[in-house]
């Protein structure tokens, strides 16, 4: 009798274990059905943090403009955030390709290799021209030189001209200051002025426009180049002659195209913008946004 009771207990325990096993097995199967096995698509910062915040990164030339637009936009739209940082056009474009920002700001067009990298990453860059700008060649106010031809400027930056007396100045060595290679201004200057030549190897590079301003303002022998919007009384802007006479970097000459170092400024988005990104770009392109571009020292597109 005792043996029969033990048998019943064992059978009951086996049944319980089987039932529990089926329950756990069913739970596991349900989890497998819910997991599709695909890697989630890379999201932009705004998709991760919510649609009330967007991130811009890139050109130091575009930085003051973008900051002013962001401040005005957020003042008019409480609860919405627009974060703007610099670092250079190349840095911003890389961030867009990597899905880290909503807008890349740039003072040059994207390169073919950047477009290819974007395609590989599933990013579809769309270009938006938001303003125009000019590049000023600057010297220390103590420097008597007031203008340069493009040939002279090319010689200074490729190293074939190394003394200010060679361009009508005093007998002093020329100290050339340049942006680093991540800068769109660096690329534009190389294409338009150096025409394929390399920068002289002893050129001092700066990661930001402010560094060029500081160096030139403190060194009577220095020469540099910056966006017109950054000009202040600590430096002197030179007139440039590209073959049609000496031209100053004035607003009239830049907007008319007479000044030889004029260029467009860009926003790049992943595909056609939507949501808060579209709202912000629409604001920048509105009458109020374009008026603000003029106030900051740039030149509107409309």
Language-model segments: which ranges?
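Exported/periplasmic ABC-transporter solute-binding proteins
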Residues: 2-14, 18-302
């Amino acid at each position: 009798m005792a043996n029969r009771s033990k048998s019943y207990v064992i059978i009951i325990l086996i049944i319980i274990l089987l039932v529990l096993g089926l329950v756990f097995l069913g739970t596991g199967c349900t989890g497998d059905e819910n997991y599709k096995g695909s890697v989630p698509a890379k999201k932009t910062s705004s998709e991760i943090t919510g649609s009330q915040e967007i991130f811009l990164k890139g050109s130091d030339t575009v930085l003051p403009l973008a900051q002013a637009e962001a401040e005005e936009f957020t003042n008019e739209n409480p609860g919405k955030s627009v974060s703007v940082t610099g670092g250079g056009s190349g840095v911003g474009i890389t961030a867009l390709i990597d899905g880290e920002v909503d807008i890349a700001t740039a003072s040059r067009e994207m390169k073919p290799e950047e477009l290819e990298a974007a395609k590989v990453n599933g990013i579809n860059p769309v270009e938006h021209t938001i303003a125009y700008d000019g590049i000023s060649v600057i010297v220390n106010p103590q420097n008597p030189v007031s203008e340069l031809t493009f040939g002279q400027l090319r010689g200074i930056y490729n190293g074939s001209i190394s003394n200010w007396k060679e361009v009508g100045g005093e007998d002093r060595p020329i100290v050339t200051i340049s942006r680093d290679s991540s800068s769109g201004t660096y690329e534009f200057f190389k294409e338009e002025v150096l025409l394929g030549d390399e920068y002289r190897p002893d050129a001092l590079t700066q990661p930001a426009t402010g560094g060029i301003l500081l160096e030139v303002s403190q060194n009577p022998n220095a020469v540099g180049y910056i966006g017109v919007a950054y000009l202040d009384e600590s430096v002197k802007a030179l007139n440039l002659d590209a073959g049609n006479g000496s031209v100053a970097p004035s607003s009239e000459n830049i907007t008319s195209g007479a000044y030889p170092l004029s260029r467009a400024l860009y926003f790049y988005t992943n595909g056609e913008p939507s949501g808060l990104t579209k709202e912000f770009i629409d604001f920048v392109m509105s009458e109020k946004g374009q008026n603000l571009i003029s106030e900051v020292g740039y030149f509107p597109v409309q």
